[in-house]
Amino acid sequence: EPRDLELCSRLNLWHVVHNNEQIDWLAAHKTHQPHRVFLKLNSGMNRLGFAPQAYRSAWARLNALPQVDEISLVSHFSDADADRFGVSGITHQMLAWHAASADLPGERSIANSAATLRHAADTEVRGDWVRAGIMIYGGVPDHPEHDAAHWGLQPAMSLSSRLIATQQLAAGDSVGYGSAFVADAPLRIGIVACGYADGYPRHCPTGTPVLVNGVRTRTIGRVSMDMLAVDLSPVPDAGLGSEVTLWGRGPHGSVLPIDDVARAGGTIGYELMCALARRVPVRVA
């Protein structure tokens, strides 16, 4: 909004310009300090940005404004994590990027996490700035083709809880709503204080990986609002208060990649990181 420009000016915040209305706002803005902007090219993702044929005229408009001090060039890949129609997913957008910005001055930024990892040797892709998002948290942008170990990524975000109860099942006993899991033999289970109201994906089925005291095991039955159940067979010493790692770094050097949990739930690690409920206590270490 136009009023945001004053805040950007006072705090020296760089901001993205992606349409002509924003250039109009800048032209009308009485700024305290000149603005530093990223001019967005729509190179093929078709969300934000100027079309390639309009990019240079947008740059010229910005460059003529006394309110603008520095113009950097930016775009965003849609398919950097995979191939697109049988060729590298970035090919069509790099062609548009070159055509629209080849002789324009300014620092450049087009690489997201996937491009930063998969095209690390390409200086044109790396540009002057990379926008590393998911990889900063240890998530893998091209999972399941590659995992965190392949890229040398470490989790920076973990979700953990504890066992609040244990139950001993007999063969034929069921667990949770809808009796979605039925034991085919005697089985000891644990109840974890975490559920979909905390942001854990409700659609995670029986078999979703989880760590108990750093040992990998599985969820069983449906995820409830505030609780979920886990198989304690691999962790016979687990009991009330035992640590449970839903994703991330667990005790004794154990790690449960968030992408393993996301894949089981039919989603991606990005969504899990964004979906934690406000009621979940956050500790920054």
Q: What is the role of each PLM region?
A:
Residues 23-36, 41-162, 166-170, 234:
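Active-site loop/helix belt of alpha/beta enzymes
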